[in-house]
């Protein structure tokens, strides 16, 4: 057996052929009720709740930010996957490996006075980081979805990994006795993806300025932001 990390969370993916809902699981079994569900263990980040319309690629992500709830409504761009030819078993399912190169912006924001006024604390210029995203999907469950935003393959994605996290399916239940209702999240401030990124950046800047105005002398902290 292995120890469970403090940063490890359990999620459930409810899905049918037209929609899916990925959310953190707080119960041992999902209640309330569609046709299938699978349980994932995620190590490395907070995914929030993600609802996807599989046919249109539209999504709604429910995300908390400093005590406020946002509903991020937008459309996923089509992913360009490369099949590697590798296969492996995840549980009883034969899975195929697909990868893609993902470009993301990484910035470091410096906190602290260090003999400077808060207004002089500048953002470090944005840097672009390329990471390889690796997924394992099974055509034995022919539904083009997966955990979080991962999708676009001819089968259910059961495992995803990159430099920062791994999301692994630990259980799949097809046609459960209790029907599962897939409902899009509704409560929250509605924004699109770009608007939410801007809100995140503004909040970080606000925190930095408040920190700089505080009594703390010298030293500092650095926060890495990856979009």
Regions from the PLM with identified roles:
Residues 1-227:
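Extended soluble regions of mature proteins
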């Amino acid at each position: 057996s292995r120890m469970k990390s403090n940063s490890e969370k359990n999620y459930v993916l409810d899905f049918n052929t037209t929609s899916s809902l990925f959310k953190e699981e707080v119960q041992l079994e999902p209640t309330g009720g569609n046709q299938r569900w699978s349980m994932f263990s995620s190590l490395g980040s907070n995914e929030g709740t993600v609802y996807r319309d599989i046919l249109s690629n539209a999504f709604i992500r429910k995300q908390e930010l400093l005590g406020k709830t946002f509903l991020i409504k937008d459309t996923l761009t089509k992913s360009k996957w490369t099949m590697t030819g590798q296969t492996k078993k995840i549980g009883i399912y034969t899975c195929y490996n697909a990868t893609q190169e993902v470009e993301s912006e990484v910035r470091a924001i410096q906190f602290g006075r260090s003999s400077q006024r808060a207004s002089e604390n500048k953002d470090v210029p944005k840097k672009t980081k390329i990471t390889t995203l690796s997924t394992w999907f099974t055509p034995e469950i022919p539904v083009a979805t997966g955990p979080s935003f991962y999708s676009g393959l001819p089968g259910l994605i059961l495992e995803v990994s990159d430099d920062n996290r791994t999301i692994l399916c630990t259980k799949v239940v097809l046609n459960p006795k209790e029907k599962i209702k897939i409902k899009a999240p509704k409560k929250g401030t509605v924004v699109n993806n770009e608007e939410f990124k801007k809100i995140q950046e503004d909040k970080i800047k606000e925190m930095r300025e408040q920190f700089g105005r505080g009594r703390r002398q010298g030293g500092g902290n650095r926060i890495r932001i990856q979009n």
